Amino acid sequence: MTQAPPVATTPRNYPIFTVRWLALHTLGIPTVFFLGALAAMQFIRR
């Protein structure tokens, strides 16, 4: 990935809960959970 220009990389304490973090996790966590549930269902034999 390309690095940001040196002007924007001033050392500071970056927040964890950004809009990008929120968007990635609200989409990613249910997707991973759903894929895990589908994978687990493949091994269920009734």
Swiss-Prot record:
GO terms for cellular component: photosystem II reaction center; plasma membrane-derived thylakoid membrane. Pfam families: Cytochrom_B559. GO terms for molecular function: electron transfer activity; heme binding; iron ion binding. Keywords: Electron transport, Heme, Iron, Membrane, Metal-binding, Photosynthesis, Photosystem II, Thylakoid, Transmembrane, Transmembrane helix, Transport. Its main location: membrane. InterPro entries: PSII_cyt_b559_bsu (IPR006241), PSII_cyt_b559_CS (IPR006216), PSII_cyt_b559_N (IPR013081). One of its GO terms (biological process) is photosynthetic electron transport chain. PROSITE patterns: CYTOCHROME_B559 (PS00537). Heme binds at residue 25. It is found in: Cellular thylakoid membrane. The chain crosses the membrane at residues 21-37. It is a single-pass membrane protein. Belongs to the PsbE/PsbF family. Heterodimer of an alpha subunit and a beta subunit. PSII is composed of 1 copy each of membrane proteins PsbA, PsbB, PsbC, PsbD, PsbE, PsbF, PsbH, PsbI, PsbJ, PsbK, PsbL, PsbM, PsbT, PsbX, PsbY, PsbZ, Psb30/Ycf12, peripheral proteins PsbO, CyanoQ (PsbQ), PsbU, PsbV and a large number of cofactors. It forms dimeric complexes. This b-type cytochrome is tightly associated with the reaction center of photosystem II (PSII). PSII is a light-driven water:plastoquinone oxidoreductase that uses light energy to abstract electrons from H(2)O, generating O(2) and a proton gradient subsequently used for ATP formation. It consists of a core antenna complex that captures photons, and an electron transfer chain that converts photonic excitation into a charge separation. This is Cytochrome b559 subunit beta.
